[in-house]
Amino acid sequence: MGESIAQQRGPFARRLQEYAASIELTLSEQQVNQLLDYLELFEKWNKAYNLSAIRDAEGMFTKHLLDSLSIAPHLTGERFIDVGTGGGLPGIPMAICFPQRHFTLLDSAGKKVRFLFQVKQALGLSNVDTQNRRVETFQPQPQFDGVISRAFASITYMLTWCNHLIHDDGRFWAMKGVMPNSELSELPKKYIVKASHALHVPNLEGERCLIELALAQESNSKA
């Protein structure tokens, strides 16, 4: 069995700071500690709650934590919802990095939301709200500036199921592997791609990208 997160905190802390600097993200010592505390909680609860198939410390650090941090330079807005958040990825890391912004973490699996509530309490994340419900039943007031998802099977499904969550000037951010050209070719006409960002994560094989979408300007309503 490999080393735990706790046994590798020193090297992981250094790598976190190096990666943050490479994407022009400033992290305090407290934020680095919170990120690693979160990863330790994830590791502990994963054994019983099956939050992720990734079990080794290096895999969780790279494929979960660094991958989540990679989107930090691209988010704009103040209020976000992470849909299908699972174990809190990327919502918890983003909430730690941006304490002045608010993040709602939504998942239909009760055990995962119980874990997220424990993380919120343990780390003192006052800018996090958890929701245990299906996305189509959640009616936020006010609506969000942005929807973030790492989990939806397709971008069209994301837009369809999350359409009601954001205001007309809001954004959808879809985290993907290789550029999903076939998905983008099937976008509903009232949506446009505002930008696509290549994401660079050290020691992570394969391509990663972030697709930013919005309601087309000529669409006056999302109805």
Swiss-Prot record:
PANTHER family for the chain: S-ADENOSYL-L-METHIONINE-DEPENDENT METHYLTRANSFERASES SUPERFAMILY PROTEIN
InterPro entries named among the record's database cross-references: rRNA_ssu_MeTfrase_G, SAM-dependent_MTases_sf
This protein's UniProt keywords: Cytoplasm, Methyltransferase, rRNA processing, S-adenosyl-L-methionine, Transferase
Gene Ontology cellular-component annotations: cytosol
GO MF term list: rRNA (guanine-N7-)-methyltransferase activity
Key word Cell membrane present: no
Source organism superkingdom: Bacteria
Entry protein name: Ribosomal RNA small subunit methyltransferase G
Binding residue positions for S-adenosyl-L-methionine: G84, L89, V135, E136, R150
Disulfide linkage: none
Family listed: Belongs to the methyltransferase superfamily. RNA methyltransferase RsmG family.
